[in-house]
Amino acid sequence: MSKRLRELEKQVRALTEEVTRLRPENLALREENLRLAARVAELEERLGQNSRNTSKPPSSDPPSLLPPPPKTGSGRKPGGQPGHRGHQRELVPETDVDEIIPVKPTQCRDCGAALRGEDPAPRRHQVAEIPQIKPRITEYRLHALCCGRCNAVTTASLPQGVPPGAFGPRVVAMVSLLTSFYRLGRRSAAEAMRDLFGLTMSLGSVTACERIASAVLAGPVAQAQAYVKEQGVKQADETSWYEGSARKTVWLWVAFTEQVTVFLIRASRGTDVAKDLLGQGLGVLVTDRWCAYTWWPLKWRQLCWAHLKRHFQAFVEAGGQARRIGGALLVEEKLLFEWWYRVRDGTLARSTLRAYTVALRRRVKALLRRGSVCGHRKTEATCRELLKLEPAMWTFVRLAGVSPTNNASERAIRRGVIWRKLCFGTHSEAGSRFAERMLTVTATLRQQGRGVVDYLTSSIEASLRGERPQSLLPMTAANVA
């Protein structure tokens, strides 16, 4: 019996030693398992990121992402509805018609009798056509004459307003527009000038046209930048850009106002560039939560609710308590925008919106507090930051003229994004200056309903005469300036 006890005691000691030895190993394995589980969750969450729950563009969505549910049909047939007034091309005023050709029937369609007379209101049919375009070539013969008194030879200079290069202002304007707004490569732009206008150009000539336009636009663009800084409401956004043969990543910035939009291309995405673009905190600024804008006074800042909606959707997809909080926030967001659309359409007074929003704001703040301790790390971090910025979620309710989203600035910068994707950015700093200036000019002129080619042509002509180029500012602001 004692021998059996001694064997059991020996086994117990061995097992105790083994447990003691394995306990740290087990603890280490448990810690490693927790780390790996957290890493897997992080990677799965990253794989689940798309344009609906982050700021990623829809073009980056994977094929596996299910499309949004189809909208419920109205039950009506496609096309114009009964009673709907049709749309058709408007006729050009008779004063702008180049040629009028009367067309009269010669005989009756029933009996064949000859027809005479005038129709006081004939049916008008207009056909627009572009005539064959041929470049107008002007040759300047600069004579060199010898003085009969001192034998000095004097060569004539080009008259004022004549460009020193081979191409005139309108050619420079059109080439610059093709390589910027229409995003053609230099070779394609040269081919377009040959096919459309019968004008042969080298790639070097295309680059020279860009350089001329960029230099002429420097003054008007600087004036537009100063104008934007002084505006009471502006939106801002930024996106990546490529510069140089190595495709170094730099940043394209935009500041949008009601009448003027300006762009900058800079190496940084930081606060210094934001201050250079926007000024010193004057007026209301509508942006996303990017840290470069945190210096702007919170009282005069509006967070973009389109971005907030995507954050709330990310809460839902995180699962657990974050899912319930995100769903509740999406319900509040939908209700808020139903009210906002009515204010925008004029069917709800802003004072009523302010009254409605009081209780909704309390509910949103309570949900964010719950989210800050929900147990999901990213949801907690986002909710804590939103609680710090919470006053900036409601500026559009308080002030007229402020949008709840920065969608206008995102639409403006989208043309730059497409340019970057098609042309791979710019090859030099000079190219970046050309890009930011042409983006500023084309966006601003289109906002104001002004012609881009005519503006560029007149500005280059003014520069050749030694005069200031035409202003980009709205007429009233330009007159003051």
Question: For the regions a protein language model found, what residue spans apply to each?
Answer:
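Short, flexible loop/hinge motifs at secondary-structure junctions
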Residues: 1-166, 235-236, 242, 287
